[in-house]
C-alpha cells in the first residue's frame, strides 16, 4: 500500500504538470487564435468569458458524476479530452469550429480541475501531512513549460496546429500512462480513517469562507495575468519587452513558493501559512501600486507570487478535510467540486473589475482593490485550522502510514 500511495502521488503530480502545460499554451496564444479565426475585438471577450463559465458548469457536473464514477476514472477520461480540445482550437478554419473547441475545452477543464483536486485532497488525507502545495507546484512548472513552448512557437512562426498537435501527441500518452497509478478515495480512506459522518451533504455555511477566499485569490491572480504587462508599460513607462517579464517572474516565484510551501504547513500549520501568504501578497500589491518605476513594480509582482501561491492549494485542502471529517470521502469530493467553481468566479470578476476601476480612476488605485480582497482572507484564516491530531504545527497523525 505504501508503494501505491507513492505512485499515486507521483502520477497525480504528472497530471497537474500536463494541465499546466496545456492551459498555458491556450492562454498565451490567444492573439494567434484571434488572428486565425478573425475574431473581432468586440467578440473576443465573449469567447474568453465562455471558457471559465463552461468550466464552472463542468465542475458542477463533476459533483454529480463522481457519485457514480470514481474521480480516478473521470480524470483518466477528461485529461486526454482537454488535450484534444486544445488541438481542435488550433486546427479549425471556421469560427464555429473554434467556438465548439473552446466550449469542449471549458467543460472538460472544469471536470479536470475538480477531479485532480479531489484526488489531491484524498491523497493528502491518506498521507496525514501536507502535500497539496506540491501538486500545484507541478502545475506551475507545467505553466512555465507551456509558456516557453508558446514563445518558441511565436518566435519560429509556427501555426497553432503545428504547435498544439505535436504537444498533444506527447502529452496524451504521458497522461494515459500516469493515469494507471492514480489512487482513489477508497485507499485514502483505508489509510487515514473514516469521516465522522457517513454520507450527508455539505452545508453552504461550512464552505462559504473557503469560497470567498478562493474567489479573492483568483481575483488577485487574474489581476497579475491580465494587467501586469499593461500596468508596467502604461503606468510605469517600461519598454514593451520589459513589460512581458512580470508574469514570467510571477510564475517562477509561484513555483518556488509552492515547492517549499508544504514544509511550511507541516512546521507552522495551515492557518499561519495562509495568513502569511495573504500579508505577503497584500504587501506585493502595495509595492506595485506605489512603484516609482518598472523595476520596483517587478519586485512587487515577484512578492505577489510568493504570497498568493499558497492560498489556493490550502483552500482546497482545508475544505476537503473539513467535509471529510464531518461526512466522509464522497461529501469531500462534492465540496471540492463546488469550491472549484469559485476559482472561475474570481477569474471572471478580477480582470473586468480592475479594468473598470483603472479606466474610471487610475491603475494604481485599481491595484489596491485586489489588495483589500486578499487582506480579507485574514478574516477567514481560522477556518483553515484542522483537528489537533491532524497535520500542522509539528504534528502528523500517528495512524498515517509512512509513505516517504
For each feature predicted by the language model, list its residue ranges.
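Helix-loop-helix hairpin linking two adjacent transmembrane segments in secondary transporters
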Residues: 135-183
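Helix-to-loop junctions at the C-terminal end of transmembrane segments
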Residues: 58-71, 154, 257-270, 358-359
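Cytoplasmic helix-loop-helix junction between adjacent transmembrane helices
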Residues: 102-137
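Conserved MFS/SLC helix-loop-helix module at the cytosolic interface between two early adjacent transmembrane helices
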Residues: 57-92, 96
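Helix-breaking motifs and short loop linkers at transmembrane-helix boundaries and internal kinks
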Residues: 38, 70, 91-96, 237, ...
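Intracellular juxtamembrane helix-capping segments at the cytosolic ends
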Residues: 111-125, 310-327
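Short amphipathic helix-loop junctions that connect adjacent transmembrane helices
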Residues: 28-42, 226-242
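Structural signature of the two symmetry-related core transmembrane helices
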Residues: 73-87, 272-287
Amino acid at each position: 500500500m505504501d508503494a501505491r500511495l507513492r505512485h499515486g502521488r507521483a502520477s497525480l503530480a504528472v497530471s497537474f504538470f500536463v494541465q499546466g502545460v496545456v492551459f498555458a499554451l491556450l492562454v498565451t496564444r490567444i492573439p494567434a487564435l484571434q488572428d486565425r479565426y478573425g475574431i473581432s475585438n468586440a467578440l473576443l471577450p465573449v469567447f474568453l468569458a465562455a471558457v471559465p463559465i463552461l468550466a464552472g458548469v463542468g465542475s458542477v457536473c463533476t459533483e454529480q458524476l463522481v457519485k457514480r464514477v470514481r474521480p480516478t476514472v473521470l480524470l483518466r477520461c477528461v485529461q486526454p479530452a482537454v488535450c484534444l480540445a486544445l488541438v481542435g482550437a488550433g486546427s479549425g478554419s471556421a469560427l464555429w469550429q473554434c467556438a465548439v473547441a473552446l466550449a469542449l475545452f471549458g467543460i472538460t477543464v472544469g471536470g479536470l480541475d475538480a477531479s485532480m483536486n479531489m484526488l489531491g485532497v484524498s491523497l493528502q488525507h491518506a498521507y496525514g501531512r501536507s502535500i497539496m502545495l506540491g501538486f500545484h507546484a507541478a502545475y506551475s512548472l507545467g505553466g512555465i513549460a507551456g509558456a516557453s513552448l508558446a514563445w518558441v512557437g511565436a518566435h519560429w512562426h509556427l501555426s497553432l496546429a503545428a504547435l498544439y498537435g505535436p504537444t498533444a501527441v506527447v502529452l496524451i500518452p504521458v497522461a494515459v500512462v500516469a493515469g494507471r497509478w492514480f489512487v482513489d478515495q477508497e485507499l485514502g480512506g483505508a489509510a487515514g480513517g473514516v469521516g465522522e459522518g457517513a454520507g450527508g451533504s455539505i452545508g453552504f455555511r461550512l464552505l462559504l469562507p473557503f469560497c470567498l477566499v478562493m474567489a479573492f485569490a483568483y481575483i488577485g491572480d487574474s489581476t497579475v495575468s491580465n494587467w501586469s504587462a499593461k500596468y508596467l508599460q502604461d503606468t510605469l513607462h517600461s519598454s514593451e519587452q520589459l513589460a512581458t517579464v512580470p508574469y514570467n517572474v510571477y510564475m517562477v516565484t509561484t513555483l518556488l513558493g509552492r515547492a517549499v510551501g508544504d514544509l511550511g504547513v507541516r512546521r507552522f500549520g495551515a492557518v499561519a501559512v495562509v495568513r502569511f501568504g495573504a500579508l505577503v501578497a497584500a504587501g506585493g500589491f502595495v509595492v506595485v501600486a506605489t512603484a516609482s518605476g518598472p523595476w520596483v513594480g517587478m519586485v512587487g509582482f515577484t512578492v505577489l507570487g510568493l504570497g498568493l501561491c499558497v492560498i489556493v492549494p490550502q483552500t482546497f485542502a482545508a475544505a476537503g478535510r473539513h467535509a471529510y471529517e464531518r461526512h466522509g470521502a464522497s461529501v469531500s469530493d462534492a465540496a471540492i467540486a463546488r469550491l472549484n467553481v469559485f476559482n472561475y468566479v474570481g477569474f471572471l470578476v478580477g480582470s473586468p473589475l480592475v479594468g473598470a476601476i483603472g479606466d474610471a480612476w487610475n491603475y494604481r488605485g485599481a491595484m489596491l482593490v485586489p489588495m483589500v480582497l486578499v487582506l480579507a482572507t485574514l478574516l477567514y484564516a481560522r477556518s483553515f485550522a484542522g483537528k489537533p491530531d491532524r497535520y500542522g504545527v509539528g504534528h502528523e497523525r500517528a495512524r498515517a502510514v509512512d509513505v516517504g
